[in-house]
Amino acid sequence: MDSITTAASVVAAGLAVGLGAIGPGIGQGTAAGGAVEGIARQPEAEGKIRGTLLLSFAFMESLTIYGLVVALVLLFANPFAG
């Protein structure tokens, strides 16, 4: 693998993880804030809100994991390497 491809792969891997974590991070913060407000308004609905929140966290976190998988593929199984 030549040096340009290696450098581009490392930069792309960093961008994949970094940019792949921004959206889910913002979404998780917004969802957690909404859950806290919902529990404050209706404490008896805490169980339902918490269950829905954890499920939505799992879906949001999967986007970050996809970014990590793309980064690992670029670093260790690079399809662009000759």
From Swiss-Prot:
Gene3D superfamilies the record matches:
F1F0 ATP synthase subunit C (1.20.20.10)
Sorted alphabetically, the keyword list is: ATP synthesis, CF(0), Hydrogen ion transport, Ion transport, Lipid-binding, Membrane, Thylakoid, Transmembrane, Transmembrane helix, Transport
Compartmental location: Cellular thylakoid membrane
Tell me how this protein sits in the membrane.
Multi-pass membrane protein
Where does it sit, as one GO cellular component term? proton-transporting ATP synthase complex
The record's principal subcellular location, in a coarse class, is membrane
Query: Which regions span the lipid bilayer?
Result: 7-27, 57-77
Q: Outline what the protein does.
A: F(1)F(0) ATP synthase produces ATP from ADP in the presence of a proton or sodium gradient. F-type ATPases consist of two structural domains, F(1) containing the extramembraneous catalytic core and F(0) containing the membrane proton channel, linked together by a central stalk and a peripheral stalk. During catalysis, ATP synthesis in the catalytic domain of F(1) is coupled via a rotary mechanism of the central stalk subunits to proton translocation.
What is the protein name for this chain? ATP synthase subunit c
Q: Which organism is it from?
A: Prochlorococcus marinus (strain MIT 9313)
Organism lineage string? Bacteria, Bacillati, Cyanobacteriota, Cyanophyceae, Synechococcales
